[in-house]
Amino acid sequence: MFNRQTISSWLIAATLAFLPLSSQGQTEVSHHFAKNNGVKIHYVSAGDKNPGAPVIMIHGFPDYWYTWRKQIAVLAKTRHVLAIDLRGFNKSDKPKGVDNYAIPLLVEDVTAVLKQTGKKKAVICGHDWGGMVAWTFAMTHPELTEKLIVLNLPHPQGLTRELATNPQQQKNSAYAREFQKPGAHKKLTAEGLASWVTDAAAKEKYLEAFRRSDFEAMLNLYKKNYPRPPYELPKEAAKVKVACPVLLIHGLDDKALLAGALNDTWNWIESDLTLVTIPGAGHFVQQDAADLVTRSMASWLAR
C-alpha cells in the first residue's frame, strides 16, 4: 500500500508481464441511454452481472466509446464496465450552445449513467477531456467515487501551471486556440478527425461515429473549458483534493499535453497515487500501449 506521500512509477513494469491477461480480443456490449435534464447520453455496457463498483469510462477528443474496446475486453471479465459517448459525440444528444458543454454538466451526465446502474459508487476512468470530467467528478462527488483512473490528462492545476510557465506547452496548445475561434468546426472532417486511427477496421467505425457527431458541439469543449491567453498561474491551491486512490497513466510522447504537468500531482490528492509513465506511447495511450494500459488497470483495480 502506498501512502499519500509516495508514488509507484512503472515505466514498463516487469511485475505486470506475468499477469494472464490479454487485451487483444473484444467482448460483446449492449447499448443503452441515460438522461440528464433532457439530454440523452449513449453508453455501452459489458459484464453487468459482475459484483462491485462499476467502471465508467469516458473518452476524449476526437474519440468515442470504442476507444476503450481493448480495456473493456479484459476488465469486463471481473467488473461491470460502462463506456459513454460524451454529449455531442456519436449516439449521444448534441444540444446547441457553448454553455451546454461546461464540465459540470458533463459530470452530471456521468452521474446519470451511474444512477442507472443502481450502484452507489463507481470507478471513474477518463482520457483527455474525459480525464477532465473524471478529475472533476472525483472532486465534486467523492461520495460516488471509489477510485479514479486518468489517462493523458494531468490534474487541472498542473495543466494550468504549465500553460502559464512553460513556453513549449503554450506552443503545443496552439491547436486549442484554433479550436476556440468562431467557425473552427467548419474546417473539420470525419476523415481528418480519424487520421490518428491506424487500425483499418477500427478506422471505419470511427468514420461512422464521427459522421454521426456534431463538430461544432465537439469544439464547444474547448470554447467553454480550455484556458485562454493570457495564461495565468492558478490563483490559489486546489481547495478540494481528490479523496480516493488515483491511477495516473501518461504516454510520454504526447505532444498536446506535456509530462511536466504531472509534477506535484501528489499535492492535490489525499489518498494513494500510482503513476504509470509509458515511453513510446502518445496521447492515445490506451490504444498505443493497449496491453500495458489494460494490465496496469486490471492489476491496480485488483488490489
Positions of the model-derived regions?
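Serine-hydrolase catalytic-loop signature spanning alpha/beta hydrolases and amidase-signature enzymes
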Residues: P62-K70, V81
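Active-site machinery of serine-nucleophile hydrolases
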Residues: A76-D85
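N-terminal signal peptide c-region/cleavage motif recognized by signal peptidases
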Residues: P20-S22
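Catalytic histidine-centered segment of alpha/beta-hydrolase-like enzymes
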Residues: A281-A290, T294
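Structural cue for short, hydrophobic secondary-structure segments
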Residues: M57-G60, A83
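Flexible "cap/lid" subdomain of the alpha/beta-hydrolase fold that forms the substrate-access gate
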Residues: T27-V29, G38-I41, A46-K49, P54, ...
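Active-site glycine-rich loops that stabilize anionic/oxyanionic intermediates
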Residues: G60-D63, D128
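Bacterial N-terminal signal peptides that target proteins for export
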Residues: M1-L11
